């Protein structure tokens, strides 16, 4: 554990300490609890490890409280001109573990430049900065894409106005989210809306994330029903029994066919969100290249706001 090491007296020594901890794994009472080089599962330990390290060597480490709150960290960085580390690839688990150390280096430099103590840096991040970032209350745009997401919905989830969820980083604010509840429910149970653009959180196990809300409950559509449906029985995700469901893009035809199934159950699909389809101009006469811009592109862009 951390207590087996000497306290670092430089950034280089602090980095060596951190690399050693994430590489050698975790031992508990003499037993190897997490194997060496298991960086994928080490991701789950980074946040609590940051608490211990920030007490052991506060000069170089800080408590990381932005897990599932990466949106706030990004806003703080934008507001105060802080360059965050490059995002490692999803499967680069060691690089993702090292993301925390790279943040430590960046905030160490920020602290020194601004004459802050370790405690003052923590107060800056989790009090001053959080209170100064803009909580934008913008309208939800019309959806341009529909996505499947999945996972159990527990009673506490259903009582929340919004919740943090795994999804595709390409998800845009306002997009439609078709929620498949996994076993033992094994059915599509509701349709939700993405309240934010998708982002990547390197220290979040599932990488891509969004905030979702505006849940509309629908009649359950079971996996068995979809497997028996003429259209969905041929759909690759249904054939995979919704494995890898989170962030699976739906075509406009997929969503239309889903509305068909929902309507057949007697549900008023007029209450459900519709995919945005721009109105194309009528009586278009294209003769030269400039006509494309004036008669098609400009009206299309105007209709999109």
Predicted feature descriptions by range:
Residues 35-56:
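Helix-hairpin-helix
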Residues 159-167:
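Short alpha-helix capping/helix-loop boundary micro-motifs
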Residues 171-175, 187-190, 304-305:
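Catalytic centers of nucleases
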């Amino acid at each position: 554990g951390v207590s087996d090491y000497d306290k670092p007296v430089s950034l280089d020594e602090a980095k060596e300490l951190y690399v050693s901890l994430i590489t050698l794994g975790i031992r508990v009472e003499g037993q190897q609890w997490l194997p060496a080089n298991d960086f994928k599962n080490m991701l789950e330990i980074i946040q609590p490890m940051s608490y211990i390290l920030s007490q052991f060597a506060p000069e170089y480490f800080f408590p990381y409280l932005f897990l599932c709150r990466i949106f706030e960290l990004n806003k703080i960085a934008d507001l105060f001109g802080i360059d965050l580390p490059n995002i490692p690839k999803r499967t680069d688990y060691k690089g993702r573990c090292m993301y925390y150390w790279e943040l430590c280096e960046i905030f160490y430099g920020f602290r020194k430049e601004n004459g802050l103590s370790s405690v003052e840096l923590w107060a800056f991040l989790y009090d001053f900065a959080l209170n100064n970032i803009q909580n934008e209350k913008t309208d939800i745009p019309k959806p341009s894409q529909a996505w499947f997401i999945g996972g159990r919905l527990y009673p506490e989830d259903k009582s929340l106005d919004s919740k943090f969820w795994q999804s595709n980083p390409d998800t845009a604010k306002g997009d439609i989210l078709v929620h498949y509840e996994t076993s033992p429910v094994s059915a599509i149970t509701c349709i939700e809306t993405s309240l934010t653009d998708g982002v990547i959180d390197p220290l979040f196990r599932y990488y891509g994330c969004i905030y979702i809300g505006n849940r509309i409950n629908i009649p359950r559509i079971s996996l068995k029903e979809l497997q028996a449906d003429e259209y969905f029985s041929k759909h690759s995700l249904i054939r995979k029994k919704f494995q890898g469901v989170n962030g699976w893009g739906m075509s406009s035809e997929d969503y239309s066919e889903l509305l068909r199934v929902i309507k057949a159950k007697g549900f008023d699909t007029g209450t459900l969100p519709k995919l945005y389809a721009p109105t194309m101009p009528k009586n278009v006469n294209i003769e030269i290249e400039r006509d494309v811009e004036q008669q098609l592109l400009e009206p299309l862009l105007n209709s999109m706001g």
